[in-house]
Each structure stands twice: as structure tokens, then as C-alpha cells.
Amino acid sequence: METIIYVTSIKIKKSIIYMTLQSDQKLDPLSIELVCRNKMSPAAVPMVFSISHTDRTVIQTCIDTGLLRLQNDDWEIVVSSETEAYTPILDSHIRAALILFSYKIKPGHNFLFFPMGGPGHKFLLRCRPLTKYDGAGTQIRELTAFLLAKLLKPLWKKKKIWLIYEKYSSSAQDNGFYFFRYCMEQLPPQERRHIYFILDKSSPQWADMQKYKKHILPFMSFRHILYLLLADLYVASDARLHAFAWKPMPNLISREINRHDIFFLQHGVLGLKRVDALFGKNGASPMTYFAVSSDAEQHIVTEYFGYEKNHVPVVGLARWDVLEDRSDSAQKKLLVMPTWRSWLEEKDDDFFCKSDYYQTYMHLFQNKELLELLKKNNTRMVFYIHPKLKEFMKSFHSESPLIQLIPFGQCPLNHLIMECSMLITDYSSVCWDVYYLEKPVIFYQFDSDLYEKTNGSYMDMEHDLFGDRCIREDQLINAVRDYIQSDFHEKEKYKKMRKDLFAFRDHNNCRRIYDFIIKNR
């Protein structure tokens, strides 16, 4: 019989969380630890405990949050015997209690600790900064919307509401926006009547989106939360919970969000980053429908993610419908856009500035050979950081007017892609957009060993890439020089690969997406 340990009681007094763990099996644990599995800064804190045996094993233990570091972390409990290690799961009563009542510790410094259920209802202790959505006002809106949705659902079901959004609901410039714009501008009024876009009022695109005013839902407003509960379908470039406050405490709304169907527009094309553990059918954020851009990508999703082929339509990315080459031969631009690193996300500035990622790009921006090459050929380098690392953009700087640093949201990414003459990236799926436009791509993969170890890919980085691969800075400078001298012409061997990597290049992707949804709803 499988041994399962349940968390059956949680009580909080000041900075200490007191817990009862129980199992139907007899256990004699040697140790209990609170473990953080952060890949770059793992940690383990011993927990004191007492144990009793009757007809079951009962363990009393506690967590002193005063001993834990104040940074974005998820901690789990590991109960170890001589031969096995177990992670306790929350029983149904505790899961309900965490949703209905407030279990949290505010240790100061604008941070928050709270217990929650992870994958498979595993106990997690989350630490994160306080946000403006942690107050009583948000909880009242959530509860009111939840109760009203229960009353309205039978009447509103026939409306077939679609909610469209992007990462963190903070922007309108990716596949979500372009599909929404298609719906607003190409569909007849009756067909677009119940299609809405979720957007934070602090978004740089908020003002521009007001022309669609009645179809815009202000993020975390009462109307937004109500429509989240009543929607028939989410259509998004990221997971379901990007439509709600990020990393919330246990609540009624998140559970309902996770029960909704979603058409996944994707943020980019799969290949350079393994994400099946996240977006797979049995992953942390499974999808209902999964848009892809080629038969090759469809094979990845059916083979590695576990989806049926009829749920993986080959339709193309919505934003490609507006892509066109706008590069200027008089002022050439090298777009530099590296992807994020899981080990750097939500870390502090000091940690980030000590990373190879930061130091590599800062060293590149100061490379005299590169700066001379740019100056001599009237070329500018444009650096655009990934949205998950946007808070670190202020740490980058360059004294050269030839290096332009653009904060996330200041300029639509599509515009940067269309205006560039060439892309320098590492593992970012933005490479597919540039390749779609028949522009050269250089893959600067200075930390490939660590990346393969922590992320992995579906493509063979040494043989399958559709652009030059560089590991060292001198290789990168040489590759840049070669492309400048060839007037940024794509190499023939990379041109030949395109027909197998794109099923369509006809600017009808949004139409295919819409037709598929209508046919399958």
C-alpha cells in the first residue's frame, strides 16, 4: 500500500506555523525538513517534531518563518525515513479552510508567507512580496463576484463569452492582441459582441486600447473577476492564471479559473525550450487547444506534451498576420533579445548583477571591436529584455549612442522585429518571427550547458538551428561582421529549412484560429 502523509491541521501564531501530519501507515521518520528547490539557491531547514503511534502515525511539527529568507520561494516539507522520503499533501478539510479563512504571516519588509496546495495538493509554503491585491478590498470583490456568478451562470451560459489576454494581463502587443484586433475589426457586430480583452490599467497600451472600450476589462476589477467566472473560453498567449493576480493566496477564483477551457495561442514557436512539464496535458498548466505553426511543431506537441492531434491545430501565430520587413538600409539595427532564465526570475538586483547573464551582455555593450564595427557601418544595436526580467532593465547601461536599451512595453516587440536587419538571441522563440521575415538570426548561447541542464530543448542545438551558433563573444563579433559585410543576407543553408518549419505564410492565421474555435465550441 502506498504511504501517504496528510496535513490535517494548520495553526498560525505570530511567526510560527504549527502543523499536524498523519498517515495510516506506521512511520518512524529520521528527519523532517523544509526544503526550497530553487535551482540556483536551494536550501533546507530542519524542523523539530514529535511522533505518536496509535492506529495511525501522528506527527506534530512547526515552521518558524523567522528562520527563512525573504525572497520569492516555494518551500515543501520532506519527511525522511531510512529508505524513503515523503512530501505531505493537504487533506480536503485543510484545502477548504485555506480558501475560506486567512492563513498568512507578514514578517515585515513587504513580504508575505502563506501555506497553499501545490501540484497534487502537495503542501507548499510560499514566500513572495506583498501586492496591492492582498488586501480586504480584493477579497470582497472576489467573494461578491463568486456569489453573483453562481446566480447568473444559467442565464449567461448562452452568451459564450471569450476572454483574451497576454502575460500577466499587462500588455496588448502579442498574439492575444492581434487575435483580439482581428475579432474587433473583421467580425460582424453579432459575432464579436461577447469577446473581451483583459488589460491592466498600468499597461503602456492602455490608452491605445480605449478605442475598444466596452470590450476592455480592467484587470482585477469586479467586472473582470465576474467575467472570468462566467466565460465560456479563454484565448491567451499564456496560462490560465495570467488572467488573475499573480501567485495569489488560496481563493475561490483561482480554482474556478483552472476549470475553464482555454485556446492556447502560444507566445512563440516550440523548439528551443522544453515546456511540456508546464503546458503538457499532465503538466502544471494544461491546455484545451494548442495552436502550432507547422506539422513539425504539431509532432512535438503530440509526442512530448500528450495531446490528441485534433486538439493541436496547425494555424500559425496570430501576430504573423501583420509582419512585414520594415528594415531601413540607411540605419540598420541589430535586435538583441535574449530570453529569461528561470534561476534569475524574481531575484533581487544584487543577485542579478552578479549573474553571467548580466555580466555577459554588459561586457558585450562595452566591446570596443563591436562598437567600432557598428560605427563604421552606420548600424545600431537595440537591446530588449524579456518581460519576466523587466525589473532588471534599469541595471543595464551603455555610454555609447550606438547601443539602445529599450524597456519592456516602451515599443511593441512586433515593430522591433520588423525594423531590425538581424536578430541576436539565445533561446528565445522571437527567433521564429525574424526567420519568418527571411532575416538572419545569430544564436549567442554562452550558457548552453547550464541551460540544457535546467531547461532543455526539443531541437539539437548543434545541428538543427536555422542560424549561426556562437558560444564565445569573439565568435559573436565575427558572425556579426560577416553579416554586416554581406548586407545582412541570409545564408542559403538556412533558407532551405524554412519550408519545413512554416505551414503558412499567407497572413490568414487569425482567420484559421477563429474558424477552428467556432467549429470546436
Residue ranges: model-predicted function:
Residues 247-268, 353-363, 439-450:
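A short, gly/pro- and small-residue-rich
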Residues 506-521:
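C-terminal alpha-helical cap of glycosyltransferases
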Residues 20-23, 43-49, 55-60, 64, ...:
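Active-site and donor-binding regions of nucleotide-sugar-utilizing enzymes
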Residues 217-227, 387-432, 437:
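Donor nucleotide-activated moiety binding/catalytic core segment of transferases
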Residues 1-161:
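Basic, ligand-binding patches in group-transfer machinery
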Residues 395-400, 429-504:
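Catalytic binding pocket for nucleotide-activated donors in carbohydrate/polymer assembly enzymes
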Residues 172-180, 184, 188, 318-395, ...:
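Conserved catalytic-core segment of nucleotide-activated headgroup transferases in glycan assembly
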